[in-house]
Amino acid sequence: MSKLIITTAISGSRRKEYLEKLEERAKKEGKKIKIYHVGQMMLDHSHFIGVNFSAENVLNAPPSVINAVRSAVFERIAGELPKTMKTYDAVFINIHGVFYWKNVFLRAWDNYYVSQLNPDLFLAFVDDVISIHDKLKVRKQWKKEK
C-alpha cells in the first residue's frame, strides 16, 4: 500500500537535497517513489500560461496570481494521484512551509488541498538558523531581503 507524504520547510533548509538522497536510496533498495516539487511545478505552469514567474520574482507577484497558479498545480497533482498511488511505493508532495518576504509572512500552501489530499504523513524539515541564513544570503532572490 502506497503512502502519501507531504514534506515542507522554509527556504534554505535543504529538504530538496534530502529528498533527492532518499530517492537514490529507494532506487537502490528496489522501491519506487514519486516526488512532486510544487515550487518547480508552479514555475513550469506559470511559463506554460504566460506568467513571468521565476525563482527570483515569484514572491513579488500578486497573491491572487500565486494562489491561482498553486491551485492549478494542486489540481494536477490531485488528478494524477489515484494512478500515481498505485504505481509508486511512496508519493511525496514537497512544498515550502512559509515565506517571510518584505516583512510579511506568506503562506505557501492551500489548506483546502492539503485536507483534500489526506496525507498519511506530514513531515517538516528543520535546520538551524545560522545554516539557513548562510544558504539564503548567497541566493539571488534573498540577497535584498533582510
Model-derived features: positions:
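Post-Walker A helix-loop "phosphate-sensing" segment adjacent to the P-loop in P-loop NTPases
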Residues: E24-K34
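ATP-dependent NMP and nucleoside kinases share a basic, alpha-helical "lid"
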Residues: I95-Q141
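Glycine-rich phosphate-binding P-loop
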Residues: I6-L22
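Pre-Walker A (Motif I) flank of P-loop NTPase domains
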Residues: M1-I5
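ATP-dependent small-molecule kinase phosphotransfer cores
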Residues: K34-L106
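Short, charged/polar "capping" segments at the starts of alpha-helices
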Residues: R14, L43-D44, I130-H133
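Hydrophobic, Leu/Ile/Phe/Ala-enriched alpha-helical segments that form helix-helix packing faces
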Residues: L22-A26, I77-M85, L136
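Short, intrinsically disordered, charge-balanced linker/junction segments flanking boundaries
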Residues: K143-K146
